[in-house]
Amino acid sequence: MTYNPRIGGFTHVKQASFDVHVKRGEAQPRTSFAQQIKRIFSKIGETLGQLFRHRAPDSAPGRVRLQGVRYVGSYRPTGDAKQAIRHFVDEAVKQVAHARTPEIRQDAEFGRQVYEATLCAIFSEAKDRFCMDPATRAGNVRPAFIEALGDAARATGLPGADKQGVFTPSGAGTNPLYTEIRLRADTLMGAELAARPEYRELQPYARQQAIDLVANALPAERSNTLVEFRQTVQTLEATYRRAAQDASRDEKGATNAADGA
């Protein structure tokens, strides 16, 4: 069973075989990055499918209503929606860490795939965050930022390709463990809390927790690379945002000067 983000649910898929028969002395080909990401989501989908199936209606935790918000009865409500949502996100992180940390450490191939997927997610999220912000339109800042971001991703050893001189990782997308954390949190808190704006505001926190979870489970070398890449991306964002602000001021100054002439 595999989670399909387009439909927000799980679908049954025929499990593909990744076994490759090779002759002695021949190099065994590496599975494509897309197949690797599919394997991660397949594992997550199987676990969550079991979680949902085993949750019988009569065993669901009781709910209490407080200030118009419905909270899961296993948690003592405070009336602060954001605090309650944070509690459920933290609980989801604990559950995912309990399930995935041993697997990342014991299954070298799965650990590598999660590591590369997390690096790709950091790349994609930074690119989208920067390029979709109207404040970064000024000058030629966006292409320069993407090029610098690609160089930083290349330095980590991620598989990818140059597109018009800019490096792009092969598997850019969402961190699969962040997806699992969010799905578990949705289940824990219920639809009413999950629909509140405070939950959307906490998504950067949930993404950060997913990165920290992976970093804590990885060997030291990969953990350090992950942390350093995240710090590099943050530095690049800050640097190019300042450049965009400067370019915007220059453009406004030139426009005002032309109007006054």
UniProtKB/Swiss-Prot annotation:
Q: Which GO terms describe its molecular function?
A: GTPase activator activity; guanyl-nucleotide exchange factor activity
| pH-activity note | Active in pH ranges of 3.5-10.5.
Record's GO cellular component terms? extracellular region
As for subcellular location, the record says: Secreted
Q: Which Pfam families match?
A: SopE_GEF (PF07487)
Identify the keywords attached in UniProt to this record, alphabetized: GTPase activation, Guanine-nucleotide releasing factor, Secreted, Virulence
What GO terms in the biological process aspect are recorded for it? Answer: actin cytoskeleton organization
Phenotype upon changing R230Q: Increased GEF activity
Further notes on this entry?
A: Immunogenic protein that elicits T-cell-mediated immunity in mice.
The entry's function note states:
Activator for both CDC42 and RAC1 by directly interacting with these Rho GTPases and acting as a guanine nucleotide exchange factor (GEF). This activation results in actin cytoskeleton rearrangements and stimulates membrane ruffling, thus promoting bacterial entry into non-phagocytic cells.
Assembly, in brief, is: Monomer. Interacts with human CDC42.
What name is this protein filed under?
Guanine nucleotide exchange factor BopE
Q: Which organism is it from?
A: Burkholderia pseudomallei (strain K96243)
Q: What is the lineage of its organism?
A: Bacteria, Pseudomonadati, Pseudomonadota, Betaproteobacteria, Burkholderiales
Encoding gene (name): bopE
